[in-house]
Amino acid sequence: MKAPKALTAEEREKVEAVIGYHFIGKERLDKALTHSSARPAKGSDYERLEFLGDRVLGLCVAEHLFKVFRAATEGELSVRLNQLVSAETCAAVADEIQLHRYIRTGADVKKLTDKNMLNVRADVVESLIAAIYLDAGLEAARAFVLKFWAERASRQDAGRRDAKTELQEWAHAKFAVTPVYRVADRSGPDHDPSFTVTVEIGKLEPETGIDRSKRAAEQAAATRLLEREGVWTRSTASD
């Protein structure tokens, strides 16, 4: 397989502008955005960087939570940390940055399932964090993380449990039934899909969630139903 083309100078500038960091070693940005389906036999891709970025992200978020939520217990901090470093949150950051426009992939990426497409977007964010860390150190990586995670950490719903788990337990306790999720619509290209999912519980009015992955849309639908039924307090933070 031929090595994928490097990002153009214009593409690099667009990515650097939105992330708020300008790379010293431009090749690090290229490596961070190269999916395994596009790599040459001995080339580098973001999977190794993702391994490192996952650890850097966890440290930066844990440190931030420790400083901000001084009265929180270890268990409460862990719930927030797990949510903030989850694939869903990382993928949401990727969507905010619109990294899907710049990830270099091969034809095989079209065969990925919806869940794996979410993981692709999540992993590339972690690889980007690692690339910044290797390029300029922990302070630069921390600045990037805080730019995109600090507000998320402060949201009212940041310490919530997983919405689907919460909804399932509530439905079992109140109605002795299991929530049913259905994909009502899928639109958009393979690299940037949009899913509309409905969730039904017995005779209750269904709720709908829309997101760029089936999994995230299910979470959105579950969240809306929990808030509508008063199980959760509606978050006043904007998404």
Swiss-Prot record:
Catalytic residues as annotated in Swiss-Prot or TrEMBL: D54, E126
Catalytic activity field: Endonucleolytic cleavage to 5'-phosphomonoester
Main localization (coarse): cytoplasm
Location in or out of the cell: Cytoplasm
Domain RNase III, first and last residues per copy: 12-137
Domain DRBM: 162-231
Purpose of the protein: Digests double-stranded RNA. Involved in the processing of primary rRNA transcript to yield the immediate precursors to the large and small rRNAs (23S and 16S). Processes some mRNAs, and tRNAs when they are encoded in the rRNA operon. Processes pre-crRNA and tracrRNA of type II CRISPR loci if present in the organism.
Protein name: Ribonuclease 3
Protein species of origin: Allorhizobium ampelinum (strain ATCC BAA-846 / DSM 112012 / S4) (Agrobacterium vitis (strain S4))
